[in-house]
Amino acid sequence: MELSYYEILEVEKHSNQETIKKSYRKLALKYHPDRNAGDKEAEEKFKLINEAYGVLSDEKKRALYDRYGKKGLNQAGASQGDFSDFFEDLGSFFEDAFGFGARGSKRQKSSIAPDYLQTLELSFKEAVFGCKKTIKVQYQSVCESCDGTGAKDKALETCKQCNGQGQVFMRQGFMSFAQTCGACQGKGKIVKTPCQACKGKTYILKDEEIDAIIPEGIDDQNRMVLKNKGNEYEKGKRGDLYLEAQVKEDEHFKREGCDLFIKAPVFFTTIALGHTIKVPSLKGDELELKIPRNARDKQTFAFRNEGVKHPESSYRGSLIVELQVIYPKSLNKEQQELLEKLHASFGYEGEPHKSVLETCISKIKDWFK
């Protein structure tokens, strides 16, 4: 079944232009040929995304499409319409994202991605309190033997597929747009004989140790950036290194944002009588929790400003204690007798089920009279 233009752009039919453009840009980046070299499926999706956006970004064409579908567009001659605004927007977008425009105004770009992402493993303690950590990284550096050309003796030939433009023009339905040349990957030049040092990759890998300051309160999947510690995309110029935290869980504390949760096991007699217990604090001292009589299982109590500090502000969350009522697994003879006496001492109050269930039983019996 053919997808609608709305389904292709992953938006609702009532979506406004801002939502449509935002979704288009996200999908165009995801499936762009520069990021999916040799992937035919991604290439087809990229074509469909552009075709869909070419219609939905134009209110007149969108109205025709909503009423008559693709046939209505063709019959109305929409394929001959003015797409200058669309291409202008498309060109500026890809100029920023990939280094070239939609109409062939290309600037030379390195095959090395400036920025890269690395996982940073942290213990619960390191994440909560922050720390200084030495990180081992491996980054891409411009090959000195070929000056990043990937070619032996730096000898490059003009690409015959695109005549050195780095782009080829394609037509999809009533859409016409530029696409990165697959033969030269948008460079306009091709390698005849690969460089022996980098095997034609244009870069070599270098190891480095970096001292990073981990902020107090960083959370799992949070990212921090180390400027100028990424790949060397041009001689002497490096991108940024992004570190994504992977925080190990603690056996006692559970974390949700800046709030900490801890379960406090308490015996059932403590719930009946009320009691004061000690609760651990991140600050190293002990907090007193006064459990009121007849507290409930899973009831929570919050200590404000005893949680985790926000990594980018002075805000600090809460420590939330959840009661976990524990009952004895077995009773000895003396305990059994004591509990039976205690139960009997409550009289009718000790059997609250009777007032509810016996009334219900009587009601049901009346139904069958």
From Swiss-Prot:
First and last residues of every CXXCXGXG motif repeat: 143-150, 159-166, 181-188, 195-202
Name this protein carries in UniProt: Chaperone protein DnaJ
CR-type zinc finger segments: 130-207
Subunit structure: Homodimer.
InterPro entries: DnaJ, DnaJ_C, DnaJ_domain, HSP40/DnaJ_pept-bd, HSP_DnaJ_Cys-rich_dom, HSP_DnaJ_Cys-rich_dom_sf, J_dom_sf
Binding site for Zn(2+) 1: C143, C146, C195, C198
Naturally occurring in which organism (per UniProt): Helicobacter pylori (strain ATCC 700392 / 26695) (Campylobacter pylori)
This protein's record includes keyword Oxidoreductase: no
SUPFAM superfamilies the UniProt entry points to: Chaperone J-domain (SSF46565), DnaJ/Hsp40 cysteine-rich domain (SSF57938), HSP40/DnaJ peptide-binding domain (SSF49493)
Described function: Participates actively in the response to hyperosmotic and heat shock by preventing the aggregation of stress-denatured proteins and by disaggregating proteins, also in an autonomous, DnaK-independent fashion. Unfolded proteins bind initially to DnaJ; upon interaction with the DnaJ-bound protein, DnaK hydrolyzes its bound ATP, resulting in the formation of a stable complex. GrpE releases ADP from DnaK; ATP binding to DnaK triggers the release of the substrate protein, thus completing the reaction cycle.
Cofactor(s) of this protein: Zn(2+)
GO molecular function, one term: unfolded protein binding
Superkingdom, taxonomy of origin: Bacteria
Pfam families cross-referenced by the UniProt entry: DnaJ, DnaJ_C, DnaJ_CXXCXGXG
Domains (record comment): The J domain is necessary and sufficient to stimulate DnaK ATPase activity. Zinc center 1 plays an important role in the autonomous, DnaK-independent chaperone activity of DnaJ. Zinc center 2 is essential for interaction with DnaK and for DnaJ activity.
CC cofactor note: Binds 2 Zn(2+) ions per monomer.
Keyword flag Iron: no
J domain residues: 4-69
Homology family: Belongs to the DnaJ family.
A single BP term in Gene Ontology: DNA replication
PANTHER family given in the database record: CHAPERONE PROTEIN DNAJ, DNAJ HOMOLOG 1, MITOCHONDRIAL-RELATED
Compartmental location: Cytoplasm
Gene: dnaJ
Gene Ontology terms: cellular component: cytoplasm
Binding site for Zn(2+) 2: C159, C162, C181, C184
Classification via NCBIfam families: DnaJ_bact, PRK10767.1, PRK14288.1
CDD domains noted in UniProt: DnaJ, DnaJ_C, DnaJ_zf
